[in-house]
Amino acid sequence: MTLKEQSSTIDRLSKENFDLKMRIHFLNEALNRRSEEGIKEMISENVELKSDKLKLQKDNQGLKRKIRDLEKQLKDQQSDKESMLNHDPEGGSDEEDRDHAQDEELLFLRERVETYELEIERLRSESIARESEKRRLAEMLKSLNDGRPTGSDSGAREERDMWKDMLDAETAAREQADEENKRLREELMRVRSEATYAIAPAAPLRSGHRNRGDSLVSHSAVSDRELYRNTAAGSSSSSTLVMEFELLKQENAELRREVSAQTSMLTSRNREKERLYQEIEELKLGQRRDRSIAGDSILDRSASRAQGRPSSSISDRTGQSPIDDAEREDWELRNGQLRDQVSALKLENQAIRQELEELDKAYSADVEQAEEDIQTLQQERDQAMQVAEERDAAFQELRAEAQEELDALGDELDQKIEECQRLTEDLRTQDDNLRALQAEMRSASEGIIRLEEDAQNNLQRYKAVQQELEQCNEEMESLEKSLYEANSKVQRLTVQIESSQNEIAFLREEQDGDKIKIGDLESELKTYRMSLQSEKDKTKELEGRLAEERYQREVVGSKEKQEVQRIMNELNREVSAAKEECRKLKKNLSAQEIETNTWKERLTDLENNLRETLGDLTGSRSSLIANIMKLQKELESTALELESTRSTLDEKETLLRNRDALLESHGLESRKLSELLERERQARRADKQSFEQALKSHHQASRTITQNNSRILELENARNQDRKRFTSLEQQFREQLNERNSMLLTIWKRLSGMCGPDWAHSNSLINGNLPSQEVIGNILFWPGFSRNLLLAVKTLENVISSFKTRVKDVERNLTKQYQTLEHAFSLRIKKLDRLEETTMNMRAQLQTRNQTGLSPELSKLRGENRLLKAELNLLQNHPRSRSTTAGVAGSPQSSTIDLAERGSLVRANTAAESPARSSIPQPAQMTNLAEPTGAVTRPRQFKPSDNHGNQEVWIKRLHELERRLKAEREARLLDRNGARRRLEERDAENKRLRAQLDRQRLRQGVSTETSTDDGGHGPPSEPTTGDEGYREREEEHSSSEGEGITVDIEV
């Protein structure tokens, strides 16, 4: 290859490398976008863009409204100004200044509207560009999937299924995110509307000047945001991310402010509700006090009447008590319902606060994750820049090395051309060498095919080993899972044992408590019986009092008639006062009803607002109704229970009365004895039952304790066995890890040795550390080590993939050189034939001269003398051509030259033709050419003087030619022996190269397997330094071969 071809191939390869880098970059971006983090980022970006769009639309609408209001104000001010100018021309200057300021503000607002419209268009174009980029990436993935070989259909199907699943998951996640975003936006809008509704009544309309100031402030804030965004769009990707993060922080702060305002409003409303509840409870307490006063006993009334007290208005009001009680019960029910509603609203408020706190936490976590992602992206960008700079430096070094190698190859070519000139005389041996070389080429091609087959077999073996490794990893994972499950089971069993122990203690405590309760119940029974006896005594006393009071009423009846009229008057006065008090109470009740209605409306508004905030417009009311129904059911159940208890109490009372009647018939002594007997029997029965229950519980506890102890022993044994297994598994796993690390280290050493010392020196460091078992075993250094391994494998792939091209180039060069050698071989065979013919003719002439005499020889010599004179004249006329092309006159094309002269000049001609073909003149050859010409010219000058001397000269020349022929034959024999020796050396070198090829094929199998595991089925990403190193070694080897390789080229 020439320098131009090599430079063109280098440029082509660099372009292909750049294209592959770009494709890898875009594919990595697509994969990152299709990952979970990328999906989250896209969702967050989508949410941000939509929220920004909504904000911009709202701002745009607000600005349009403000522009309309300002235009209206302008028109009004212009009309006012005209009227003022008509009435007061001096105040026109102030109005003009105001108009100028308002015009500037209008221009500013219009500019802001235009910028907002441009921002909306830019966001739309960005969304369209993102969609087109997604489509382009999808088409690229489809093309890549279509461009893969048919052998990897199963892998392609798996990848397609994986991409489909990822797409479905992404769409589902995006739909969920959109739904959540819509829900959150609706809730935010509702909360904002509630806040505006709550704030709107308290905030009257301000003047136009204040509106103008507020608009300027808001537009300044919006302009600041847009300036942030414009600067972010102009800067790099990292700055854009930082600015977006700052914008997110600002929006987060605004949202927190809104949430704090809403929470403050809610707290104020809750305080108002609590105040209302307190007022309602106070009203209830007052009503209950009134009821307690109205429910005085009959004895108090009779006592008051007997003592001559004036009857109270409350006693006369007892006739209206049923209606008041019903109304009060209704009010109490209403108050209970309101209280339940308020409690439900409190619970809903608490749930909303919890959701807000959770959302705040999630948002802060997302912000932190975004910061971490930004930092990781910046680090990856810096690493990529460093790698790119290192690769550029390596490429420049490789280019310089290639240039130096090309210069060295040029020098070596010159040396080889000289060696080829020395080997031109070995023509017959080259036929055999040609055949041997052809056979060796065939055997080499067969060996290469065999090596390729071996490489494929090694690839299959490597795949099998990789599958076995994966199976081992899966088994390790399953063992780890079983270990985790066993640990969880052990923990569960320990918890169960503790719970069983707690239950045993609890049962013992319950047994002790039951005994205490039995004693308490017995004491309560005694107290109930004593109370019954006392009540009976009280009833007897009351009957006596009633008889006495009746007697006193009959006695005092005559005296009371006189006082009745006075009492009636007083009662009428009290009734009128009571009526006035009732009216006042009704007014108060009506006012309270109005207040309760207002509060009911507020409560309904609050319920509706809370339902809107929660998004459940129907659920809260039904839940409230369900709670009320539950309470009603509980009330009914409690009422039924009360009725049942009352019935049981009545039954008991009847039983007690019957027993009392029976006991009165018997005597006190029999009654006492029977009671004592029954008590003793009951006590004995209770003791027996308690003793039996205690025995049963004791036996059950002992059984459970023994069972638990046995279970504990079994679990401890199983736990010890599991620990032993886990320790053995951990040891095996560590041994396997050590073996793996040692194997990876040996693989790395061999791969780096194959890639060359320069490559190993530039790529051996892993975060500043040399590769070792400890470094490989560390999780932090594993990505760097795996990256270096993949780089080494890729370099070997590039080296092995370039073998075919090199072999083809060598074959082409060999065919070209073989053709040139065949041509030169044919020409030199012809020249040798001519030389043989000339020598045979010379011998025949010598024999004829000896036989026939000197007369024809003299005539021939004279003719030759004439020809030599003519040649001398020509040489004198053309000295330059004689000095450069002295051997042209002796070429076989001139038919008039004598055979003897041709024989004398044939060696010079054969020596002069080789440099003429090689197009590189040599000084030694020029001197060799000059010498025979001088040898020819000298005898020509002495020809006319002495024929006998000329004849002796010709004889000497013939002897010299014979001697030269013998020397040439001996040189040919020596050259043949040297060529054979060189061929043997070349055979040994070929064997060594075949061994290297075998090793490289094996390593290529390992590297292709790792590349397939890595997912890279396409072409190699970039030409690495390992390929160049191998080329250097190969070229050095070819230069060190010397003459053996020149023989190959000749063939």
UniProtKB/Swiss-Prot annotation:
Q: Where is this region: Disordered?
A: 58-100, 141-160, 294-329, 877-902, 909-928, 984-1051
**What spans are recorded as compositionally biased (Basic and acidic residues)?**
58-90, 294-303, 984-1001, 1028-1040
Task: Output the InterPro entries linked to this UniProt entry.
Answer: Cnn_1N, Mto1-like_Mto2p-bd
Localization, UniProt: Cytoplasm
Primary location class: cytoplasm
Alphabetical keyword list: Coiled coil, Cytoplasm
Q: Does the record's keyword annotation contain Lyase? A: no
The entry's function note states: Involved in regulation of nuclear migration. May be involved in regulating nuclear positioning.
Protein name, entry field: Anucleate primary sterigmata protein B
Lineage runs: Eukaryota, Fungi, Dikarya, Ascomycota, Pezizomycotina
Q: Gene encoding this polypeptide? A: apsB
